[in-house]
């Protein structure tokens, strides 16, 4: 079984002890080392909001964007995102078929941890990317999607599980790590390809979180589909996000 190997660079920041995580696909963006701000990953995890967000009913990408926004707003931490893409072998979850899952990730002393607070019954603390992949895909035989692998990136627009076997080999799942501002798989694809799902050129960069997107994500994360139709959550999200 192949282990999760994250393609990152560790760069020394202004502090002699800071180890910022720089992602290969996003070389101009750094994931903050929380230790330089006096934070511990366990404390940050315990403070993640699970009261406003409907943890059991919300979509992972919506709550992940809100939590990434919270890290930036409350602790001035630039968190990343870890996107997992399933194959037919790994995407069956009970009666459902998942094609992707996403969690915020943070950097502590140069090591990355998944902060998936959406499953309070089974995840009670930060876990390593390997542990997270094993938990949600049942495997760590996962391929990292690189910026030049356009055929794999284009699949992010489709909404279907990935093939196990491609020209890159045979894998149980795929993953990519992004800045925290990338909301959905489609947004990741737009950013890397420079085109939308119709092939039209776009300039889409989310090194910072977009306020309109996090507001929309919040409304969807705190209400049911019926509640959204009735306008539920809008006031709560504006107040909570400070927008």
Task: Please give the residue ranges for each predicted region.
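N-terminal signal peptide c-region/cleavage motif recognized by signal peptidases
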Residues: 13-18
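A structural boundary/capping signal
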Residues: 19-243
């Amino acid at each position: 079984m192949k282990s999760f190997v994250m393609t990152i660079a560790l760069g020394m920041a202004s502090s002699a002890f800071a180890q910022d995580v720089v992602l290969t696909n996003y070389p101009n963006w750094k994931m903050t080392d929380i230790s330089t701000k006096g934070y511990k990953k366990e404390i940050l995890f315990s403070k993640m909001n699970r009261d406003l967000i409907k943890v059991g009913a919300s979509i992972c990408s919506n709550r992940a964007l809100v939590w990434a926004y919270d890290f930036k707003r409350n602790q001035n931490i630039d968190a990343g995102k870890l996107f997992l893409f399933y194959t037919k072998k790994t995407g069956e979850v009970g009666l459902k078929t998942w094609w992707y899952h996403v969690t915020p990730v943070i950097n502590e002393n140069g090591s990355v941890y998944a902060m998936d607070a959406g499953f309070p019954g089974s995840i009670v603390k930060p876990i390593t990317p390997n542990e997270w992949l094993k938990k949600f895909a049942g495997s760590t035989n996962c391929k990292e999607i690189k910026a030049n692998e356009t055929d794999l990136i284009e699949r992010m627009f489709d909404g279907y599980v990935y093939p196990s076997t491609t020209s890159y080999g045979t894998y149980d799942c795929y993953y990519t790590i992004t800045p925290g501002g990338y909301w959905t798989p489609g947004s990741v694809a737009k950013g890397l390809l420079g085109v939308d799902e119709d092939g039209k050129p776009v300039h889409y960069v989310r090194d910072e979180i977009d306020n309109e997107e996090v507001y929309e994500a919040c409304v969807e994360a705190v209400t049911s589909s019926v509640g959204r139709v009735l306008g539920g959550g809008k006031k709560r999200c504006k107040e909570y996000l400070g927008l």
